[in-house]
């Protein structure tokens, strides 16, 4: 059967859950055991001695019972019909004589009177060192008696199962005897309630016998009698564990019903040394908890499952996240877990029990064909980076210990925090790596939010420990990984995927991005065309004069990137395919030679690109300038552009700043473009599409939105592209409509991409030279903002120290309040007269958001212009007139002092002094300077204006105003100076 402590745990759980009874555990049995071992030295005595030191007799149905109890009950059974048995007390003298004889070992009970024997029996229980019913169960037994009749019996019997086995045997024997007495109640007048009242003080041993009776004591005696009466009525079931408790133990441990009894070798010697009882009991409870957790973690696998089968099962289907089947821990370590290990087990357990469909190996297949359908090929497999930005990095140290023991050799794939298992190339499970790299699938199709991807960019950038080493590893290993070789072997084409380039970019186009530019159901025809070296359109395309590659890289997801080679490469035999899929070293050398050849033909410098790609993260502004979207347009007919590559206007460079909205959104993502590898050199014969187009826009606009004017502008060229590319795919020899701008969408494209296409079309008609317009201020602001997301930026050491919070002096605050009140109290006529001449020194902000001064007058409008204009318009007009483009983001909270004769004048001499002392600060009433830097404002004194204006501007305060000021701490503000809050302040 189950171990006693497992049964005890199940009983305690049942009592707490069903009846609300909590048992104070555990030390009572150890204390009793210690007393019992100490009492073994006492020999010969019967009264006042623990049970284990008494001589025992074996009773067939009940086990080992003390001999005195057996003899006394046997003697009383002969006189069971005696009226008032146990109620009538015997002679005290005879009781003492009988007691002394029994202690000396004489057998005198057979000749004694029944009342004397009954008195001896009560005295025997009363003089025990500890009560028969354990003291730590008294409160629980009392609570059980306050339940209903049915529940009271069940709870009392469950509590009796918590007692030690010798005690249970004695209680069962004695209460069966009392039950037989109560069954003769018609003769002896002693039913179970009467017997309970008599034996309750003896069995429960209350020490309150000499105290006065009170309501409390009476209630306690009643509860004690109810406990004994329940035991008498249910005597045959005392200590018997119900079957439903035993059935709960496997479910509690997470063991299958068919499983054999779990081995409990660690529990065998616990009671051998009573001094260590407390420590071992605490250990055993931890063992039960850990055993239950381990069984639950192993997905309810039977505990007799061999360890080898389990590890083989776990390693046969390698998953991206932790598998649902854990390896079994060794037997010697399964019973001693530290608290830290328990916490980690609980964390993993909660992580596995999440109801996600991609955590289980049953719902997510190991191998899924990506190219079967272009739309729904990888709906069920999402990248772990897309799911959680920093979970894998945070749990990698803990998981690596389990990975090391699983004998699965892993090769680094360049993905942040994820390792792909190294499987032999002959297995078809290699194709499941496409699902890991399928970052192009938008989660909007599942109804999930895309906003988390923007947050994950910063998290993942912050988790990258060494940016340069990651770039180098991606450069050297990604395009030559076995995934590419498998793909080349399977497809038989020179198509090299760009998926590894975009491993670190979570943003994609919308859900149907896997579709090719033309409307075929799959990309097989394009593969055949690229594999066929004699295709007519391929013969017409020379180095850097074909336009299909940028269209495809802009249009579709980065996963299924199809790249075309020039005709010189296609004229080689098909052995080049085998060499690409063969040795990695040969592939690297061939590719390097082709890169150098292509760059030498195009006249560009390879080393410049390489050095530029290895630049630091902080050079993102130059990175954006360098990676302008280069769009190649082969406008010549057939091969006419082959010789005049340098002269024909086939390349247009436009920076992202040509559309400010595009630049604003793209620059926020330009950290992820740093992770673009230089393995775009494999596409060396083709101009590179700007990665910002591929990354910065995950397709947030709905697909059904009406076309903007930019979309409508680009519609005719889209039709030409569709016609040209479909004709090229079918191999039409007379094809000459190859004019392509950026991309061809088979569905309405996002608005920003259409803007890019129209911008490129406008670039064709502007000038043959390359257009580059950059706004360094906006780009640098975005870069600085984005750098705050990165923990590894080089400027971390230059972070400003925390702001010192300075409390504004009381005197200064009072001055501000009084100046506001003083200004509000001026007559309206006086204010209107001043408005034509001078601006008030007290500026009221237009809104809480902008905090722009509203009373700054534009000099170009003359003195009669209305003063209350919006602060933003005044600021724009003054900056345009003075030709100063020095506006920063901080100029919206405190306006710079531009050389304005009206704003240069101040109202009162007192305020004039205050301004001169503070180096040109405009003092706003109640302005909080706590968390703002003190800016040095630019004051230009070169503007000449007439002295008459100077004389008009300065206003002398009246006598009333001087009298009103009582703002110092010595002269507090009078009651008359405080305005009610409901009264508006006149401007």
Swiss-Prot record:
Site (Arginine finger) location in chain: 87
Summary of the function given for this chain in its UniProt record: GTPase activator for the Rho-type GTPases by converting them to an inactive GDP-bound state.
Highest taxon of source: Eukaryota
GO cellular component terms listed in the entry, alphabetical order: nucleus
A GO BP annotation: positive regulation of GTPase activity
Cross-referenced InterPro entries: ARHGAP11A/B, Rho_GTPase_activation_prot, RhoGAP_dom
Domain Rho-GAP: 52-239
Span of the signal peptide: none
GO MF assignments: GTPase activator activity
Positions of region (Disordered): 297-341, 632-669, 700-756, 960-987
Protein name from the UniProt record: Rho GTPase-activating protein 11A
